[in-house]
Regions:
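Patatin-like phospholipase
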Residues: 1-22, 33-267
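Catalytic nucleophile serine of serine hydrolases
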Residues: 26
Length: 267
């Protein structure tokens, strides 16, 4: 995605295209922010920091600190330029709602929305939910009143696998080049590519994978909701202290399995 954004930024500088609004979730929300800051180079620094940290610790708890560091580099009133132009999505598990944030009170509020959008349970923090209720957006918000270009990182199983398979990569230069070539092909041929397409001009293939993604998101968010409220109920049980020991062991087991699996691709 980063390579595609570099390409789009260059077209924007040449006044070949006009960007009115941007929407993103998870790492996409970070890249949208960097795009608006005209600081896409910072993404490579974030990539290196997260990769090295995961290699040492087996999780990405540092992501909150990374975003706090980014906050320090943002101009004081920058958030005003993001109101109604930057749309960040995340899930409120407590209310079972898909939230799209597009108005911000200040820069801190903006970064806080991105933290919610990037939070993957137990991987980005020690708890299931960020601030007891929020998790990753999982899908960006679509604009129905504008021509919308979708940079889809989950367009098929190949892109999903390649996204997490970074074992032999020293940096993200190759990914940047691939992203730039993909969107170059899109504009050159005016046809959907693996990653890039207009949402009003998709193939059956892209629609199938996106609808599959929606179904997975539905079940995943409801599963998290179920686990969260089951844990609340269990705390009221008389022998909760014994159950808590079991839950703690189970959490450590899940974390260990997750780390071992991801380590095959990320370290």
């Amino acid at each position: 995605m980063l390579g595609a954004l570099y390409y789009i930024k260059q077209l924007q500088c040449l006044k070949r295209i006009q960007i009115n609004k941007m929407s993103g979730c998870s790492i996409g929300s970070v890249l949208c922010l960097l795009f608006k800051l005209d600081n896409l180079d910072y993404a490579s620094q974030i990539y290196t920091t997260l990769r090295n940290y995961f290699k040492q610790h087996g999780h990405l708890y540092i992501i909150s600190n990374v975003l706090d560091d980014l906050l320090l580099s943002i101009p004081k009133h920058f958030y005003k330029t993001c109101n109604e132009t930057l749309f960040i999505s995340y899930h409120n598990i407590k209310k079972q709602k898909y939230i799209v944030k597009h108005k911000f009170k200040n820069n801190h509020d903006l970064i806080n929305a991105i933290k919610k959008s990037c939070y993957i349970p137990f991987l980005c923090g020690p708890k299931m939910l960020f601030k007891t209720q929020f998790v990753d957006g999982l899908k960006p918000y679509f604009f129905n009143d504008h021509k919308t270009l979708f940079l889809n990182l989950f367009s098929d199983y190949k892109t999903i696998f390649s996204m997490i398979n970074i074992q032999n990569e020293l940096n993200n230069s190759e990914r940047i080049i691939k992203g730039a070539l993909d969107i170059h092909t899109f504009f050159k041929t005016n046809k959907p590519t693996y990653m890039c397409y207009f949402i009003d001009n998709t193939t059956i293939y892209h629609r199938f994978f996106f609808q599959t993604r929606i179904v997975i998101i539905y079940f995943l968010t409801h599963f998290i909701f179920f686990i969260y409220y089951c844990s609340k109920f269990i705390k009221r049980i008389k022998y909760y202290q014994y159950i808590r020991i079991f839950i703690s062991i189970y959490k450590q087991f899940i974390k260990k399995i997750t780390y071992t699996y991801l380590k095959l691709f990320m370290v």
